[in-house]
Amino acid sequence: MEQTRIQMFEQQIYPEIFAEVAGNVMDRFGKQKKEIIEEWETILQQYMDQLADLQEEEEAPSIQEIDFSFLYTSLEDKHAKFQIDSYGEGGRVSGESILTEYISADWIADGAKVLAERLAERAEQENLRGYVRAAEIDKLRLRAVRSLLLCLAVRFKYIIRDMIDFRSLARVQKEPCFLIQIGEYMDWMKTIYAVQPAVDIFNCEQDTDLRFRSFHAIHYNEKQFKAFNLSQSDFRDCVFTESSITDCLMNDCMFDGCVFERLCIESTMMKGCIFANCVFQETIMKEIVLSESDKESSILDYFAPAEFHNCEFREVRLENCNADNCIVKNCDASKLGLENSSIVGSGFEERKDKEGQDELF
C-alpha cells in the first residue's frame, strides 16, 4: 500500500508540480538572461586569460575540453554553483582539471527549494504525508535539479557565444577538437560549443561526427545530402545547386551568405537555424520543420524557431512545412509560395496578411 501511494505521488503529482516550477525557473532565466550573460562573460574572460597565462608559462597543455559542472553538494551551501574545469588531450576521462573556478547558479537552487515546498504541501493536502516523507521529497528534489539542468543546457547553446570573449579564447592553445560542455559533475555533459577540424562531408569515414563543423565557401553541385546529422554546423558563403537534402538533422545550423539554387530540401529538421544574407532560387522545401509546434515542444528539449535575415526568395515553395514563430526580417522575394504550411506567429504570416494571398511578396 505504501509503495503504491508513493508511486502515485511520483507519477501523477510530481510531474505536474515540476512542470509549473520548471516553467517559472525558465521564465526567470529569460528575464535575467542579460545579467546572467554578463556575470558569466566576466568570469569566463578571467578564466580564459588565466589559462592562456599558464600556457605561456608552460604550466598548462593545450585544452581539449572546458566543462561547466553543477555541484549537487552546493545545494546545501549559501549559494549553489557550477564548477568550471579545463582538461588537456583526452578530456576529463584522461586527466585532472588544469584550472578550476566557480560561478553561481542560484536560480537552480531556488527552483529546487520551491519544488520541495510545493511537494510537501501537496502531500499534506492529499493526506499522503505519512507515506511521502522528507527523504522521498528530497529524492524528488534532486531528480528535479537534474531535469532543470537539462532544461538549461538546451538553452545555453543559444547564449554561450554571448558569454565568450573570443579574443581571450583565441589566446588559449586548443586541441584540434575543442569542446565547451555543461552538465553534472563527473556525470553527463552536453556540448554547447565546439571547434572541430575541417572535414569533407562526401569524402570522410561513415562514422565521422559531422556536428559542430565549419564549411566555408564550398560549392555543392549535384550532391545528395542523405540522413546526415549536421546539427550546429556553420555554413558560410556556400553554394548548393542541383542538389537535394533529405532526412537530415540540421538543427541550429548557421547559413551566412549561402545560395540555394534548384534545390529540393525534404523531410529535414532545421529548427533553430539562422539564415542570414542567403538567396533561395527555384527551391522547394517539403515537410521541413523550422520550429516546434506546441504539441511537439518540450521543456527538456528546446529549440528556438528558425530565423531569416536579409534573405531573397525567388520562385520558392514551402510545402507542408512548420514555420510557426519564425523570425523574418528585411527579406525580399519575387515569389514565395505556401502550400499547407503552418506559419502562425511568424514573419511569413505578417507578410501574408498584408498581401492577402498564399503567394507572398
Language-model region placement:
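Amphipathic, interaction-prone secondary-structure segments
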Residues: M48-G88, Q173-Q196
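N-terminal alpha-helical "arm" segments
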Residues: M1-G23
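Tandem repeat scaffolds
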Residues: A194-F361
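Compositionally biased, intrinsically disordered linkers/stalks adjacent to structured regions
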Residues: R118-L152
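Elongated scaffolding segments in large macromolecular assemblies
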Residues: K139-I218, E222-K223, F228
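Short N-terminal edge-element motif at the start of the domain
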Residues: E16-I63
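Intrinsically disordered, low-complexity regulatory segments enriched in Ser/Thr/Pro
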Residues: S74-R129
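Short, flexible N-terminal segments of the mature chain
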Residues: S86-L99, R141, F225-D237, L300
